[in-house]
């Protein structure tokens, strides 16, 4: 039986960013150093495949610190945590490792610096996302105002329009954020802007990679978790760039093949917490149904690496 021809365009960069890679290594090295169980507050990264693999190795995922015993190490997720969390871990004499992405930590430090200079903070982000909760939790309650949309800007009530600064979640849509920033600067001309864009290199690169293939494809598949902010943004970027069909899938088994009927070219992208093995799985699923040609489209090479915390490079002690 002859299979219909189809071209798969693989967007690159895709998949693991340096912060995700570091966070996963932290859990693996902690298990190697201290043995199982090692506790992790919140999913280390938003990907079920990754979390399940680490759970099989002996990681125990909890949502709150009080679910972890005080005599076992605990790791904080890549998204960052409010200041109160490590303070509470220290109060309980717990061994903890902070896997917060260094680029998220940069935003934390930026918020603290502005606060120390007497500026009120405005954060562009998604309410309830762990990164937003963690960043807002670096400052006293009420010191950070959250905006999610351009419309939110009009309703902001600030202490002093001359004493403001803004920061952003690192995984936002570049285009949407630019519109919100423009609205902030129009309403508050004196607002202090970040020294460097808070949206991280990996988010920027992955959105750019989707835009680069959007004009060549009939449909887009983004491999990522439904709670992954950067993966959901890739779907939105694809739709905004003209992709009639744009699906977010965790595994190849999630693909809606009916929606792909008639497609002769499909783009594949992957969020920053999706491992390459899941991309391979999707390619295999297409090869089983189509005479598939695979073309990689790389927009930039990524060479960023982050070191793991010193505590994991030191000899083990009983926690």
Curated annotation (Swiss-Prot):
<feature type="binding site">
    <location>
        <position position="230"/>
    </location>
    <ligand>
        <name>dimethylallyl diphosphate</name>
    </ligand>
</feature>
<feature type="binding site">
    <location>
        <position position="228"/>
    </location>
    <ligand>
        <name>isopentenyl diphosphate</name>
    </ligand>
</feature>
<protein>
    <recommendedName>
        <fullName>4-hydroxy-3-methylbut-2-enyl diphosphate reductase</fullName>
        <ecNumber>1.17.7.4</ecNumber>
    </recommendedName>
</protein>
<feature type="binding site">
    <location>
        <position position="129"/>
    </location>
    <ligand>
        <name>isopentenyl diphosphate</name>
    </ligand>
</feature>
<feature type="binding site">
    <location>
        <position position="46"/>
    </location>
    <ligand>
        <name>isopentenyl diphosphate</name>
    </ligand>
</feature>
<keyword id="KW-0414">Isoprene biosynthesis</keyword>
<feature type="binding site">
    <location>
        <position position="228"/>
    </location>
    <ligand>
        <name>(2E)-4-hydroxy-3-methylbut-2-enyl diphosphate</name>
    </ligand>
</feature>
<feature type="binding site">
    <location>
        <position position="79"/>
    </location>
    <ligand>
        <name>dimethylallyl diphosphate</name>
    </ligand>
</feature>
<feature type="binding site">
    <location>
        <position position="46"/>
    </location>
    <ligand>
        <name>(2E)-4-hydroxy-3-methylbut-2-enyl diphosphate</name>
    </ligand>
</feature>
<feature type="binding site">
    <location>
        <position position="46"/>
    </location>
    <ligand>
        <name>dimethylallyl diphosphate</name>
    </ligand>
</feature>
<feature type="binding site">
    <location>
        <position position="273"/>
    </location>
    <ligand>
        <name>dimethylallyl diphosphate</name>
    </ligand>
</feature>
<feature type="binding site">
    <location>
        <position position="79"/>
    </location>
    <ligand>
        <name>isopentenyl diphosphate</name>
    </ligand>
</feature>
<dbReference type="GO" id="GO:0051745">
    <property type="term" value="F:4-hydroxy-3-methylbut-2-enyl diphosphate reductase activity"/>
</dbReference>
<keyword id="KW-0560">Oxidoreductase</keyword>
<feature type="binding site">
    <location>
        <position position="17"/>
    </location>
    <ligand>
        <name>[4Fe-4S] cluster</name>
    </ligand>
</feature>
<feature type="binding site">
    <location>
        <position position="129"/>
    </location>
    <ligand>
        <name>(2E)-4-hydroxy-3-methylbut-2-enyl diphosphate</name>
    </ligand>
</feature>
<feature type="binding site">
    <location>
        <position position="229"/>
    </location>
    <ligand>
        <name>dimethylallyl diphosphate</name>
    </ligand>
</feature>
<feature type="binding site">
    <location>
        <position position="229"/>
    </location>
    <ligand>
        <name>(2E)-4-hydroxy-3-methylbut-2-enyl diphosphate</name>
    </ligand>
</feature>
<keyword id="KW-0004">4Fe-4S</keyword>
<feature type="binding site">
    <location>
        <position position="200"/>
    </location>
    <ligand>
        <name>[4Fe-4S] cluster</name>
    </ligand>
</feature>
<keyword id="KW-0408">Iron</keyword>
<keyword id="KW-0479">Metal-binding</keyword>
<keyword id="KW-0411">Iron-sulfur</keyword>
<feature type="binding site">
    <location>
        <position position="273"/>
    </location>
    <ligand>
        <name>isopentenyl diphosphate</name>
    </ligand>
</feature>
<feature type="binding site">
    <location>
        <position position="229"/>
    </location>
    <ligand>
        <name>isopentenyl diphosphate</name>
    </ligand>
</feature>
<comment type="pathway">
    <text>Isoprenoid biosynthesis; isopentenyl diphosphate biosynthesis via DXP pathway; isopentenyl diphosphate from 1-deoxy-D-xylulose 5-phosphate: step 6/6.</text>
</comment>
<dbReference type="GO" id="GO:0019288">
    <property type="term" value="P:isopentenyl diphosphate biosynthetic process, methylerythritol 4-phosphate pathway"/>
</dbReference>
<feature type="binding site">
    <location>
        <position position="230"/>
    </location>
    <ligand>
        <name>(2E)-4-hydroxy-3-methylbut-2-enyl diphosphate</name>
    </ligand>
</feature>
<feature type="binding site">
    <location>
        <position position="79"/>
    </location>
    <ligand>
        <name>(2E)-4-hydroxy-3-methylbut-2-enyl diphosphate</name>
    </ligand>
</feature>
<dbReference type="Pfam" id="PF02401">
    <property type="entry name" value="LYTB"/>
</dbReference>
<dbReference type="GO" id="GO:0050992">
    <property type="term" value="P:dimethylallyl diphosphate biosynthetic process"/>
</dbReference>
<feature type="binding site">
    <location>
        <position position="129"/>
    </location>
    <ligand>
        <name>dimethylallyl diphosphate</name>
    </ligand>
</feature>
<dbReference type="GO" id="GO:0051539">
    <property type="term" value="F:4 iron, 4 sulfur cluster binding"/>
</dbReference>
<feature type="binding site">
    <location>
        <position position="101"/>
    </location>
    <ligand>
        <name>[4Fe-4S] cluster</name>
    </ligand>
</feature>
<comment type="pathway">
    <text>Isoprenoid biosynthesis; dimethylallyl diphosphate biosynthesis; dimethylallyl diphosphate from (2E)-4-hydroxy-3-methylbutenyl diphosphate: step 1/1.</text>
</comment>
<feature type="binding site">
    <location>
        <position position="170"/>
    </location>
    <ligand>
        <name>(2E)-4-hydroxy-3-methylbut-2-enyl diphosphate</name>
    </ligand>
</feature>
<dbReference type="GO" id="GO:0046872">
    <property type="term" value="F:metal ion binding"/>
</dbReference>
<feature type="binding site">
    <location>
        <position position="273"/>
    </location>
    <ligand>
        <name>(2E)-4-hydroxy-3-methylbut-2-enyl diphosphate</name>
    </ligand>
</feature>
<dbReference type="GO" id="GO:0016114">
    <property type="term" value="P:terpenoid biosynthetic process"/>
</dbReference>
<feature type="binding site">
    <location>
        <position position="230"/>
    </location>
    <ligand>
        <name>isopentenyl diphosphate</name>
    </ligand>
</feature>
<dbReference type="InterPro" id="IPR003451">
    <property type="entry name" value="LytB/IspH"/>
</dbReference>
<comment type="similarity">
    <text>Belongs to the IspH family.</text>
</comment>
């Amino acid at each position: 039986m002859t299979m219909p021809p189809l071209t798969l365009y693989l967007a690159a960069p895709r998949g693991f960013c340096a912060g995700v890679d570091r966070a996963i290594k932290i859990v693996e090295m902690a298990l190697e150093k201290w043995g199982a169980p090692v506790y992790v507050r919140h999913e280390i990264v938003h990907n079920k495949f990754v979390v399940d693999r680490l759970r099989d190795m002996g990681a125990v995922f909890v949502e709150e610190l009080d679910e972890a015993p005080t005599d076992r190490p605990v790791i904080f997720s890549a998204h960052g945590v409010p200041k109160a969390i490590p303070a509470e871990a220290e109060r309980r004499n717990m061994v903890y490792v902070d896997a917060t992405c260094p680029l998220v930590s940069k935003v934390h430090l930026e918020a603290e610096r502005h606060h120390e200079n007497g500026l009120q903070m405005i954060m562009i982000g998604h309410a309830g996302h762990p990164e937003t909760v963690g960043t807002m939790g670096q400052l006293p309650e009420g010191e950070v105002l959250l905006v999610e949309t351009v419309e939110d800007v009009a309703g902001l009530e600030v202490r002093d329009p001359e004493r403001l600064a803004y920061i952003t979640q690192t995984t936002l849509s570049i285009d949407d954020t630019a519109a919100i920033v423009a609205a902030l600067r129009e309403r508050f001309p004196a607002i202090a802007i970040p020294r460097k864009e808070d949206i991280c290199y990996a988010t920027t690169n992955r959105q750019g990679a989707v835009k680069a293939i959007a004009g060549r494809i009939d449909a887009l598949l983004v491999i990522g978790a439904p709670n992954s902010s950067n993966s959901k943004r890739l779907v939105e970027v694809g739709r905004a760039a003209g992709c009639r069909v744009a699906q977010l899938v965790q595994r190849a088994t999630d693909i809606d093949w009916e929606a792909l009927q008639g497609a002769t070219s499909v783009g594949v992208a992957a969020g920053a917490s999706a491992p390459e093995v899941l991309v391979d799985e999707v390619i295999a699923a297409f090869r089983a149904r189509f005479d598939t040609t695979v073309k990689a489209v790389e927009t930039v090479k990524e060479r960023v690496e982050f070191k793991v915390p010193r505590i994991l490079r030191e000899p083990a002690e009983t926690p």
